[in-house]
């Protein structure tokens, strides 16, 4: 009996060695993942996707690039990982008779799953209409109906919302029964549009593949994170050219994902290698482990008036190279500042300072996976202040003096005699802020007397209910924490700015893994200079803490804003911040197990270890009261 064509393709000598596959790869019980990229700036994330896929057990990856995609991907970055890369020229040039392989057929036979990320509007249209004018579209047309296809569209907002696109989505879903779309996300695009269209976060794309194939990650000893060929996450040199862009006119850009990886490791952390070489490749040079540096929480030297009291000279941005991290999640924040500066309306405000403001900008999304803590790096955020304030909220405390005694002065202005009197709270002692955040979290509906009264078992303990529901009924759609109580607002020194948080549990990313906990916070009034960096860190910490107490893994923090503004006296300081290139976010670890902590009330500052926080210096900004 003659050998099957795909086996001959794997073993016989053909003119182009790039399409050779060893026979063991067809019978090796490995997961064969074919990753394709089309013409979109989002293709700069391809190397990150491939690297991450290679951190799973028993995975082999091959790559197909359309001709436009080759403008954004360095082939050498992929081949250095032991990955074969194919393009249109490889489809028929080796065919000189009936026994010769046809590349798009052989790749289809080899693959267990096809991932197209990004999927441009052009390729989507071809797929919906059955065109096969290049290697990828021919492969799609020849795809076995029962094999899964994962599709991550990316395009301009108006292209995504065009009715033709919706027809194409429906047609593809109808024709390819085992196809799934990884929907794009909302963001500020480079062309100036605001809305849906950017490719989904690359880590979420990898997670969908892992979930589909039920992949398990490789395990390594701590401190074994190494880079292939000395390269870090953003290995494409093209990345520098697009560091501040979000899309292009035809095929999308993607910058809502964090491209940095762990640069420090905890001695007790079980982490995953960034990539491993395939057995069939030659030995590759491995970079040395990054040195570990830890910033103790108690070592913050900045006494805060909203956390920023030290002025430093601007540090010039350094161009990205292929061996540097690119923190695209912090770039969301910086790009929103740019958008407000360019498009914001001048508005008066309660404090008399004046602002530039926009309403309901695209949400910001921050990955919390792998112990990530989104603590901004383009200025030093007063981490101890964030933690102490959060614990103060959790305890239901409303006395600003308790923070001041610890050197945290962010509430001093609102608790002053002058400010309380201006609010008509003349009977309150200095520092008594009334039934603000923590009181609503722990005693919602209780009658407020003063900050010294014992409110034990009074009102609704929303935070305790959140944790209980997450444990007992994690898929409940009413897991809500609200600080907005209209009846109590007249008694508050300052009505809450961040008013509403919802929690959401999703399935583990891999078999045997922990459920994933995400949170979404709505902020009615968002001070981009001082408040928002604090709020991002605070709610990310809260999500990590609740996940820790529930035995879950923190997954994502989503930040939704209403009146999003920049105070006029912050303009110069923020221009300095915009000149800085974001660095990698730090990692958060807990020093005690949940059972040793006991309850959410028992956390202390000493329970937190934040590693790898290496920000630029602080930037002085005045707090408007």
Swiss-Prot record:
Keywords: Cytoplasm, Methyltransferase, Nucleotide biosynthesis, Transferase
GO molecular function, one term: protein phosphatase inhibitor activity
Listed Acidic residues bias regions: 243-257
Compartment(s) where it occurs, according to its Swiss-Prot or TrEMBL record: Cytoplasm
GO cellular component: cytosol; mitochondrion
Binding site residues for (6R)-5,10-methylene-5,6,7,8-tetrahydrofolate: 527
Biased composition (Polar residues): 258-269, 293-312
Pathway as given in its UniProt record: Pyrimidine metabolism; dTTP biosynthesis
Pfam families, alphabetized: Flavoprotein (PF02441), Thymidylat_synt (PF00303)
Residues the record lists as binding dUMP: 350, 477-478, 524-527, 535, 565-567
Reactions accelerated catalytically: dUMP + (6R)-5,10-methylene-5,6,7,8-tetrahydrofolate = 7,8-dihydrofolate + dTMP
GO terms, biological process: coenzyme A biosynthetic process; dTMP biosynthetic process; dTTP biosynthetic process; methylation
Catalytic residues (positions): 497 (nucleophile)
Main EC class the enzyme belongs to: transferase
EC identifiers of the protein: 2.1.1.45
Region (Disordered) location: 224-323
Similarity comment: family membership: In the N-terminal section; belongs to the HFCD (homo-oligomeric flavin containing Cys decarboxylase) superfamily.
Function: Required for both nuclear and mitochondrial DNA synthesis.
This protein's name: Probable thymidylate synthase
Taxonomy of the source species: Eukaryota, Fungi, Dikarya, Ascomycota, Taphrinomycotina
């Amino acid at each position: 009996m003659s050998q099957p064509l795909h086996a001959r393709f794997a073993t016989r000598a053909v003119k182009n060695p790039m399409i050779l596959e060893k026979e063991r790869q067809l019978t090796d019980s490995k997961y064969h993942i074919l990753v394709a990229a089309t013409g979109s700036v989002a293709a700069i994330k391809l190397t990150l996707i491939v690297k991450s896929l290679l951190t799973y057990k028993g995975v082999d990856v091959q790559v197909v690039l359309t001709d436009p995609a080759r403008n954004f991907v360095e082939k050498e970055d992929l081949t250095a990982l032991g990955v074969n890369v194919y393009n249109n020229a490889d489809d028929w040039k080796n065919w000189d008779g009936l026994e010769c392989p046809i590349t798009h057929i052989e790749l289809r036979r080899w693959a267990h799953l096809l991932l197209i990320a990004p999927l441009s509007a052009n390729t989507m249209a071809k797929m919906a209409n059955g065109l096969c004018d290049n290697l990828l579209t021919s492969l799609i047309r020849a795809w076995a109906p029962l094999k899964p296809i994962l599709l991550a569209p990316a395009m301009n907002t108006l292209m995504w919302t065009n009715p033709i696109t919706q027809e194409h989505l429906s047609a593809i879903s109808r024709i390819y029964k085992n196809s799934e779309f990884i929907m794009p996300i909302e963001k500020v695009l480079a062309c100036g549009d605001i809305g849906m269209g950017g490719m989904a976060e690359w880590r979420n794309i990898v997670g969908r593949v892992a979930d589909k194939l039920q992949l398990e990650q490789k395990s390594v000893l701590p401190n074994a994170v190494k880079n292939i060929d000395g390269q870090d996450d953003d290995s494409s040199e093209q990345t520098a050219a697009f560091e501040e862009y979000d899309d292009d006119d035809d095929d999308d850009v993607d910058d809502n994902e964090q491209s940095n990886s762990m640069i420090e490791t905890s001695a007790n952390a079980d982490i995953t290698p960034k990539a491993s070489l395939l057995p069939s490749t030659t030995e590759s040079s491995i970079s040395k482990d990054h040195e570990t540096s830890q910033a103790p929480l108690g070592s913050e030297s900045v006494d805060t008036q909203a956390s920023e009291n030290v002025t430093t000279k601007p540090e010039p941005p350094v161009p990205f190279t292929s061996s540097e991290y690119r923190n695209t999640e912090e770039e969301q924040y910086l790009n929103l500042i740019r958008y407000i500066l360019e498009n914001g309306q001048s508005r008066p405000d309660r404090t008399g300072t004046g602002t530039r403001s926009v309403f309901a900008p695209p949400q910001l999304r921050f990955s919390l996976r792998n112990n990530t803590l989104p603590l901004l790096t383009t200025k030093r955020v007063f981490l101890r202040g964030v933690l102490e304030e959060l614990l103060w909220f959790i305890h239901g405390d409303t006395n600003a003096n308790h923070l001041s005694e610890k050197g945290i002065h962010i509430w001093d202005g609102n608790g002053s005699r002058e400010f309380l009197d201006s609010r008509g709270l003349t009977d309150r002692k200095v520092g008594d802020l009334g039934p603000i955040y923590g009181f609503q979290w722990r005693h919602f509906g209780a009658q407020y007397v003063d900050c010294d009264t014992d409110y034990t078992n009074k009102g609704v303990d929303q935070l305790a209910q959140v944790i209980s529901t997450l444990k007992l009924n994690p898929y409940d759609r009413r897991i809500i924490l609200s600080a907005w109580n209209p009846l109590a607002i007249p008694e508050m020194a300052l009505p809450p700015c961040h008013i509403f948080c919802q929690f959401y549990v999703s399935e583990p990313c891999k078999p045997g893994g922990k459920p994933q906990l995400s949170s979404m916070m709505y902020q009615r009034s968002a001070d981009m200079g001082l408040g928002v960096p604090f709020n991002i860190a605070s709610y990310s910490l809260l999500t990590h803490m609740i996940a820790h107490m529930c035995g879950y893994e923190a997954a994502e923090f989503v930040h939704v804003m209403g009146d999003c503004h920049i105070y006029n006296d912050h303009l110069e300081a923020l221009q300095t911040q915009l000149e800085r290139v974001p660095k990698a976010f730090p990692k958060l670890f807990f020093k005690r197990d949940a059972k040793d902590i006991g309850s959410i009330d028992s956390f202390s500052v000493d329970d937190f270890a934040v590693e790898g926080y290496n920000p630029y210096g602080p930037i002085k900004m005045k707090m408007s009261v």
